[in-house]
């Protein structure tokens, strides 16, 4: 398994189109000139041995030189092939280490190869069915320009981490991270490598390797979860997050830490080896290599690390299924998934540089990160996972960042992405990337997060990622402190780009890039949770944590009239908007028009169980199932008509008062019942009046079968009568038939009798002359005839002669009647005599 995990391919910058080539090419040399090799190799010894500091060759099991020629179908390669490739890359590493990577960016000084390397590092995975464009193409597309690079730096577009938290489902196009057993992690949007639970090593299971294949598919921020680390435990992905903030996706629930894809740094390599060793401990190695945080100047070393830890601890202690929290890493690259995507880019850039800077510093970072992660693990269930989640965040594919750049990483654009991603990660703008590139080694404490405060806020957001819709880091902080603090509802975050991935039809481009549309992501990728029940329970529990009153949650049947229009409008619209977004995301493939930004309370209104339950189960039974469960739409990926109806509400003006579906249904049912009753009464009146307008009434009451029933009764009676008559007729006919048959039989008998009589007469006639002849004389002559023709003994003829006048003679003739032929012959013969 280790080898398989080592073979994890890295996804490239722009989200590769589905069905594209895998990016399993060697990384380009690091900006320092060192060739970045995959840290994903489970062989920590190799990683450590190859790790070198500034400018030194990092000869990992795989050197990452982005080559367009090296394109692999993730799904097509076997683990053995991966191992072979890995060994081959190891061989190639030394010559390639010093060769500049073709994908390097001059403007930012960050080489696309490095980013690709980090991408690959995070995404070392056994090839899966998913295809990833070659790392070079990804790097070129994502990093085609320094400005793009900076933008991409925000979430390392090189790769997005698919979140192994989702289990086998992660093998889907990473829309849904793999479910990890038990722990649910949000797939990191920007992280190429999913982080496996600390208890699992990168190579621990072939399932993880399989999930890595999904991870290999690095899409733009649209679906960070699309890339799933094979290394991630099945619980790694709770839901995908927008790629602007990979943290939300990257943030697994507190228990789930996605191994952070470390920029190709010696520290990273060392950490990856350490993490692969420590995976079961506090550290997770997404690909056997962790991001060296020291190299990044401890980019994530937040000044308020303890606060972040507390937040992480809270998250880990309370990892809502819908929200993925990852603790800031005390280590240099402690980057939350939200910030890590940029951090990942920076980490790759800075991390590679810093990895080149000093492996001992990286080792220290690893140690710090490990200790911090251990602390986090103690504090939170899987802080190490969270720590590594930050790497996944960094792994955001450049294309996704570029997509966000196209739409502008402004708050409006990135809110959706960040809402899902930014819980722990601050979006890194190209400026930040540039600064980070400049400060690869100069920035010791500041991570990709713009500030510790920001990262701290991001962490708090991670707790309540749902409401973290801030495209700007400051916004993230605002949302985090404000409505975004709605951790229970965080899961209901309005759709964000993280779940959205370039559609096949869009040719790998993001719709929001093309049309300015923002993908609406739900809190978690559909199917990311082990069970819908679990999700619902967790969400409900989280929702309960919010201090919302029934009045705030939902409209009663009378609420539209009683409640102020403002409240009603806000509550209803927000509710519908959130629900609609979530539903639309699940129903429509995650691509929606840019969703309206919601406040945390709006989310509460949307998802709070009070909305659904305070009316009473009777209403719920009549109402749509969605009301019964805030996650109903998530649980059943297909949207109900109610959800579809809610979609219409999105465009409704804010001042419009909307009735909830249950109320409408009740009203409709009541109206229908009243109408039916009225029609029945009318029909009855007509019947009593004796007016023959029953048919008219019946026509007016097509829904009520009773009028038809009356007619049917009459018709049935008529039919029965007809049937009875027919039966009688049939009986009569049968009797006639029998009589006729009897008559026919009788006629036949009469004819036979007449024939017999005729024959008898003939016999008598023929015998008359014999009377004239003495019997003695005639006996000899007649006996032959009798004997020959009638077979009678010769003695009979004399007897016959004597009794010729008696009937006894006729009886014998009749007895011989069965032989009419002979008798006829005799008669014929006798006639002449």
Swiss-Prot record:
Residues 496-506 have a biased composition (Low complexity). Residues 711-747 form a coiled coil. Keywords: Coiled coil, Cytoplasm, Cytoskeleton, Phosphoprotein. Residues 178-208, 321-345, 424-452, 478-508, 602-631, 789-833 are annotated as: Disordered. Disulfide bonds: none annotated. It is found in: Cytoplasm, Cytoskeleton. The keyword Coiled coil applies. Residues 606-615 have a biased composition (Basic residues). The modification Phosphoserine is found at residues 222, 451. Residues 191-208, 803-814 have a biased composition (Polar residues). InterPro entries: CCSER (IPR029627). One of its GO terms (biological process) is microtubule bundle formation. One of its GO terms (cellular component) is cytoplasm. Expressed in brain (at protein level). GO terms for molecular function: microtubule binding. Belongs to the CCSER family. Microtubule-binding protein which might play a role in microtubule bundling. This is Serine-rich coiled-coil domain-containing protein 2. It comes from Mus musculus.
């Amino acid at each position: 398994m280790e080898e398989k995990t080592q073979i994890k391919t890295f996804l490239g910058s722009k989200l590769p189109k589905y069905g594209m080539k895998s990016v399993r090419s060697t990384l380009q040399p690091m900006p320092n000139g060192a060739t970045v090799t995959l840290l994903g190799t489970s062989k920590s010894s190799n990683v450590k041995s190859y790790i070198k500091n500034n400018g030194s060759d990092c000869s990992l099991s795989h050197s990452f030189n982005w080559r367009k020629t090296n394109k692999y179908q993730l799904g097509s390669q076997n683990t053995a092939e991966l191992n072979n490739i890995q060994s081959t890359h190891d061989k190639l590493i030394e010559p390639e280490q010093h060769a500049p990577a073709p994908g390097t960016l001059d403007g930012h000084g960050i080489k696309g190869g490095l980013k690709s390397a980090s991408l690959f590092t995070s995404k070392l995975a056994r090839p899966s069915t998913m295809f990833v464009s070659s790392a070079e193409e990804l790097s070129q597309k994502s990093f085609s320009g320094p400005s793009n690079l900076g933008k991409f730096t925000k979430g390392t577009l090189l790769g997005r981490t698919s979140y192994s938290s989702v289990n086998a489902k992660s093998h889907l196009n990473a829309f849904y991270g793999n479910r990890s057993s038990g722990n649910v992690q949000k797939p990191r949007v920007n992280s190429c490598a999913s982080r496996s639970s600390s208890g699992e090593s990168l190579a621990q299971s072939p399932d993880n390797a399989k999930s890595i294949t999904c991870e290999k598919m690095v899409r733009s921020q649209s679906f960070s979860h699309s890339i799933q680390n094979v290394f991630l435990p099945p619980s790694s992905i709770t839901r995908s997050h927008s790629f602007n903030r990979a943290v939300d996706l990257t943030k697994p629930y507190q228990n789930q830490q996605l191994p952070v894809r470390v920029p190709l740094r010696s520290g990273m390599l060392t950490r990856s080896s350490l993490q692969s060793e420590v995976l079961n401990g506090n550290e997770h190695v997404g690909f056997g290599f962790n991001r060296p945080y020291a190299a990044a100047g401890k980019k994530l070393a937040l000044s308020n690390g303890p606060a972040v830890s507390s937040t992480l601890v809270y998250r880990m202690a309370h990892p809502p299924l819908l929200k993925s929290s990852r603790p800031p890493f005390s280590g240099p690259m402690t980057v939350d998934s939200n910030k890590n995507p940029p951090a990942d880019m920076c980490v790759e850039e800075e991390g590679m540089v810093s990895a080149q800077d000093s492996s001992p510093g990286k080792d220290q970072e690893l140690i710090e990160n490990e200790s911090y992660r251990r602390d986090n693990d103690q504090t939170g269930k899987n802080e190490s996972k969270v720590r590594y989640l930050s790497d996944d965040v960094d792994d955001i594919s450049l294309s996704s960042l570029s997509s966000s750049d196209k739409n502008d990483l402004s708050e409006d654009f990135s809110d959706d992405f960040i809402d899902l991603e930014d819980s722990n990660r601050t979006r890194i703008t190209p400026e930040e990337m540039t600064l980070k590139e400049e400060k690869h080694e100069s920035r010791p404490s500041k991570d990709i997060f713009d500030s510790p405060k920001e990262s701290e806020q991001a962490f708090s957001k991670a707790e309540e990622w749902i409401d973290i819709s801030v495209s700007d880091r400051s916004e993230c902080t605002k949302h985090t402190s404000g409505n975004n603090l709605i951790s229970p509802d965080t899961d209901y975050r309005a759709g964000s780009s993280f779940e959205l991935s370039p559609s096949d039809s869009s040719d790998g481009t993001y719709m929001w890039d093309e049309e300015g549309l923002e993908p609406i992501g739900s809190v978690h990728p559909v199917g990311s949770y082990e069970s819908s029940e679990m999700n619902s329970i967790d969400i409900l529990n989280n929702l309960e944590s919010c201090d919302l009153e029934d009045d705030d949650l939902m409209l009663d049947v009378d609420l539209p009239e009683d409640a102020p229009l403002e409240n009603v409008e806000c509550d209803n619209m927000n509710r519908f908007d959130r629900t609609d977004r979530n539903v639309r995301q699940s129903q429509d493939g995650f691509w929606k028009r840019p969703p309206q930004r919601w406040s945390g309370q709006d989310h509460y209104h949307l998802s709070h169980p009070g909305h659904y339950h305070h009316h009473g189960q009777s209403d719920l039974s009549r109402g749509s199932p969605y009301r019964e469960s805030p996650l109903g739409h998530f649980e059943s990926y297909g949207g109900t008509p109610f959800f579809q109806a809610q979609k219409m509400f999105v465009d409704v003006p804010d001042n419009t008062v909307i009735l909830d579906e249950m109320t409408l249904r009740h009203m409709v049912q009541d109206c229908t019942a009243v109408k039916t009753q009225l029609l029945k009464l009318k029909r009855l009146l007509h019947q009593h009046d004796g007016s023959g307008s029953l048919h008219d009434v019946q026509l007016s009451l097509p829904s009520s079968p009773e009028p038809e029933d009356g007619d049917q009764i009459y018709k049935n009676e008529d039919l029965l009568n007809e049937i009875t008559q027919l039966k009688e007729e049939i009986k009569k006919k049968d009797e006639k038939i029998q009589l006729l048959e009897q008559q026919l039989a009788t006629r036949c008998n009469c004819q036979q009798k007449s024939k017999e009589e005729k024959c008898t007469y003939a016999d008598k006639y023929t015998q008359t002359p014999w009377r004239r002849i003495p019997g003695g004389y005639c006996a000899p002559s007649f006996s032959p005839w009798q004997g020959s023709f009638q077979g009678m003994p010769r003695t009979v003829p004399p007897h016959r002669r004597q009794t010729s006048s008696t009937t006894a003679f006729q009886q014998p003739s009749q007895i011989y009647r069965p032989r009419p032929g002979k008798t006829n012959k005799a008669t014929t013969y006798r006639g002449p005599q």
